[in-house]
Swiss-Prot record:
Parts of the chain that traverse the membrane: none
Keywords: RNA-binding
RRM domain segment(s): 61-138
Recorded superkingdom: Eukaryota
PANTHER family: EUKARYOTIC TRANSLATION INITIATION FACTOR 4B/4H, RNA-BINDING PROTEIN EEED8.12-RELATED
Native source species: Caenorhabditis elegans
Keyword hit for Flavoprotein: no
Chain spans, region Disordered: 142-166
Record's keyword annotation contains Ribonucleoprotein: no
GO MF term (any one): poly(A) binding
Name listed for the protein in its UniProt record: Putative RNA-binding protein EEED8.12
Recorded GO CC terms: nucleus
CDD domains, per the entry: RRM_II_PABPs (cd12306)
Length: 197
């Protein structure tokens, strides 16, 4: 009986090896995407907003930039202000509903001395538009604009407050009701008593 000769197919082995390597690369790419997504979620979950004092310190080193072109990029804004000092962070807020950029920005510098240099840029042309540069103000929680001009007349007389004006504090008028009526015939006005409401 003649011996059987087995010839190995090298092409099949190479194709199997290549297919296995492609599967490993694909799985590695998927795992990397998952890890990146988890890292972003952890970063957002670990974010702790600054305290009031910390926010004041940040704002003391920041400027507000108005009349910024809607298509501006952070890189372009930083390029325009790079000569003012070392920039820590540049923010162009977006509308929370439309997700479109607003027409203003904020720049935080490493040192408060850079603010004076940045204020010199007020009125300069950025994307062919004159921009407004001012020192950033710290927003104080609870200090809304609706209470301005309505402190007078809050108790009793009602002067200084617009009736029915939206967003303004309304005047509360306290009326007094005489229990037994004014005692006009009493001596020295005695007997005149009143209770609120």
């Amino acid at each position: 009986m003649a011996p059987t000769t087995v010839i190995a197919d090298n092409n099949c082995n190479e194709e199997s090896s290549n297919s296995f390597e492609m599967e490993i690369e694909a799985e590695s790419a998927i795992l990397e995407q998952i890890q990146n997504k988890m890292a972003k979620n952890l970063e957002s979950a670990a974010y702790v907003p600054p305290t009031e004092e910390e926010q004041k310190a940040i704002d003391a080193k920041s400027v507000f930039i108005g009349n910024v072109d809607f298509n501006s990029t952070i890189e372009e804004v930083e390029e325009h202000f790079k000569g003012c000092g070392h920039i820590v962070r540049t923010t162009i807020p977006k509308d929370k509903f439309t997700k479109k950029q607003k027409n203003f920005a904020y720049i935080e510098f490493d040192d408060s001395s850079s603010i004076e240099n940045a204020l010199v840029m007020n009125g300069s042309l950025f994307r062919s538009r004159p921009i407004v540069v001012t020192a950033k103000r710290t927003n104080i929680p609870g200090m809304g604009h609706g209470v301005r001009g309505s402190s007078r007349g809050t108790f009793g007389r009602g002067r200084g407050a617009a009736r029915g004006a939206p967003g303004r504090q309304q005047t509360v008028v306290v009326k007094y009701v005489y229990v037994n009526g004014p005692n006009r015939g009493g001596r020295g006005g005695r007997g005149r008593r009143f209770n609120p409401y």
